[in-house]
């Protein structure tokens, strides 16, 4: 899910800190029978929050836009900071032993003029992951 080769290497933040701007965020969530993706893209002072589902088609899967809303970019950055997004960089949540099924996620965010935050996991999530997904679902409904 690389966004573009022009961005800087991963940032290695302290456990605390904030981002000052967002260019793009993609959160990919999948499970046994579902795959969905949330995408936030910022242009100027507006942030487009989009929700996609992946549908089975004849030759694989199709990414289909279900809903899109616009929010203020500053509001989105403030919310992402409340979830401690910067501290997610480098998170790798390996699948817990003995768990046979679960939800997997992959996140990539381009922030602060080109720095990239990456995180992924399988039934193992960074702090405030649930709050982020609840917030995304809430703004889209």
Regions found by a protein language model. Name each.
Residues 2-37, 65-70, 82-141:
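Short, well-ordered, aromatic-rich surface patches in folded extracellular/luminal domains
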């Amino acid at each position: 899910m690389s966004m573009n080769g022009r961005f800087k290497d991963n940032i290695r933040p302290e456990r605390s800190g904030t981002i000052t701007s967002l260019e793009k965020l993609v959160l990919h969530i999948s499970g046994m029978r579902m795959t969905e993706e949330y995408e936030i893209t910022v242009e100027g002072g507006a942030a487009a929050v989009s929700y996609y589902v992946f549908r089975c088609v004849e030759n694989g899967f199709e990414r289909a836009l279900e809903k899109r809303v616009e929010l203020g970019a500053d509001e989105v950055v403030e919310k992402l900071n409340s979830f401690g997004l910067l501290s997610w960089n480098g998170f790798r949540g390996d699948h817990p032993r003995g768990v046979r099924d679960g939800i997997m996620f992959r996140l990539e965010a381009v922030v602060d003029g080109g720095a990239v935050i990456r995180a992924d996991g399988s039934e193992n999530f960074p702090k405030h992951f649930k709050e982020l997904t609840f917030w995304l679902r809430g703004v889209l409904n």
